[in-house]
Amino acid sequence: MIYICSPNYFICKEMKEKDDMAWKVLSSQYISQEPWFSVRKEKVQLPNGNTIDSYYVLEYPNWVNVIAITKDGKFIFERQYRHGLRNTSYELCAGVCEKEDSSPLISAQSELMEETGYGKGEWEEFMIISPNPGTHTNLTYCYLATNVEKISEPHLEVTEDIQVKLLTIEEVKDLLENNKV
């Protein structure tokens, strides 16, 4: 298992020692609280005594990413428009860890099935990352799913318009080299 850029609280729990670099929160207030994210404005004091009056923290649920490979060696990508970027891109299957799911693995398997119609196969969690430890509170659980097979048609949410693309390794390399992922 690889842990990359995990937030300080996560590392401290693992080490079971006090974090001498932690910032002191002097005040905290919610600016926005939505089902998918919340924003806090905090006044913080750094260990060196400096104070930051407006530090924004984004609270998100944990996320999952899936590198999925079919039995015949094709990589499953999703092509979709992303309004935040105002661009259509190729992406790995990804989504939110749903509260009703018992684990990130169950969330990852559900996302792959819902968005692509693929499932089964062998699953391995290979990495846990913090997408942006400076401002985000969540972790992303990354999985490799091999030998997956088509089970059903995708079951998309109303906000999703996804084209499922099965790509060879050469096609994936081309997308990466041309910054299309």
Name what the model sees in each region.
Residues 4, 12, 16-23, 88, ...:
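Nudix hydrolase/Nudix homology domain
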Residues 16, 22-37:
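Short beta-strand/loop segment at the start of cytosolic alpha/beta domains
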Residues 20, 58-60, 65-110, 148, ...:
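Conserved Nudix-box catalytic region and its N-terminal flanking loop in Nudix hydrolases
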Residues 30-65, 71:
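Acidic, metal-coordinating catalytic segment for phosphate/diphosphate chemistry
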Residues 38-42, 53, 88, 139-141, ...:
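Short beta-strand micro-motifs in enzyme catalytic cores
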Residues 43-48, 132-151, 165:
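Active-site-adjacent beta-strand/loop module that shapes the phosphate/pyrophosphate-binding cleft
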Residues 101-106, 115-121:
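Beta-rich strand-turn-strand
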Residues 119, 123-132:
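Acidic/glycine-rich phosphate/pyrophosphate-binding loops and surrounding catalytic core
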